[in-house]
Amino acid sequence: MKKKNNKGFTLIELLVVVAIIGILAAVGVVAYSGYTDNARKGAAKSNHATVLKYIAGEVQKCSLGDTDAMKNKAGTAQLTCSERKTADKVAIAAAAALDSFKNPYGSVGTPASSLAVFKDTALTTCDATNEGRTNVQNTTTTITLTTCIKSGEAVLTLSLIHI
């Protein structure tokens, strides 16, 4: 009698392996989605904190006697210290100097923009049109930063008093 040589996998074994791979893929997609969502939120919070430190440091330079502040990538000053208490001057300069900050949520808003820092009125609500966006606004006495961390969450707000 001749012996049968069975090499390979049966159809049932292959179906079980495919089912296991499908389950692992489904779990992985959900976990990855949560990971990227948390990373975006963390980046938006980091942008807010960095903008705050940057503006506070630049305004402090003015208080210590410098004449110019908030230089852009080319080294051009975006703010003359004598104008720092003029409404919107700090906000305009900060938005221009920090134009390399990118929105972790990509292009949002109308018109769509991938920038993260804007000279604009304070955010009051956080929705899909302003996720990841940090608005800078200043009066003659106060600089206000507002950031939408994630749609549906509270707006992160902080005000600085001019020195």
Where are each of the predicted segments found?
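Alpha-helical interaction segments
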Residues: 21-25, 90-95
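Basic, alpha-helical nucleic-acid-binding regions used in initiation and control of genome expression
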Residues: 85
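Acidic surface patches and DE-rich sequence motifs
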Residues: 5, 72, 149-150
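Conserved small/polar residues in nucleotide/adenosyl-binding loops
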Residues: 161-163
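Low-complexity, acidic interaction segments enriched in glycine
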Residues: 91-158
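Alpha-helix exit/C-cap motif
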Residues: 53-78
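Amphipathic alpha-helical segments typified by the pilin-like N-terminal helix
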Residues: 1-49
